[in-house]
Amino acid sequence: LGNAVLFSIGQAMRKAGNKVLYFAGYKNMIDRYKVAEIEAAADVVVWCCDQAPGFKPNRPNDRSFVGNIVDAIHSYAIGNLGDPQIALKTADRLIAIGSDRMMAAVAQARHAKLKPFMKPHHFAIGSINSPMQCMMKEICAQCLQPHVDPQTGKTSYVFSCFNQDQPLDLVDFAGLNERLKQNSLQEKLTAQWIAHCKPALNAERPMV
């Protein structure tokens, strides 16, 4: 899902004259879609997949990696995927969209494993996937997301439905993970009901 959002952002950035280095991550090879749109959104795409053998790039400057996003970024930076066409140190902005654990890993790695390869004062944001309910902008507080200032330790709160794009260094990812777990039981029950009802629905309405 994150890739579907990012390719529209990438296209807008390229149109504005920016260079875009795009790490597209997937769990399974069958999960990839909108390939042409993603290629149009980036000067360089690194196709990442947990499942071997990974993707075969269509363009000469694109790369492929089997593993997670953080390891892919590191391998790209040190040249294990070939000479970097766009150096990480030239990046002024980093945008992460995906699971809370993936965004947390990227947020942390920027100050550890990836720090030698990043511009010191780059700005990183994540599209925070807090649980949401009313979608009426700051009404029900289901999407309330804690922020922790890394300098002062002060905690503040934002409504993610009002602004999903939040600075990675402020987001309390442990708090986000706990909030997402609140709906775990309902999500599992819903999945069971879908699996139970799907055969009957398919019999009534054959797939075309």
Annotate each PLM feature.
Residues 1-2, 99:
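Alpha-helical hinge/cap motifs
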Residues 2-14:
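Histidine-anchored nucleotide/phosphate-binding helix
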Residues 13-20, 40-43:
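Conserved S-adenosyl-L-methionine
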Residues 26-28:
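Active-site glycine- and acidic-residue-rich loops that bind
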Residues 30-208:
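Reductase modules of NAD(P)H-dependent flavoproteins
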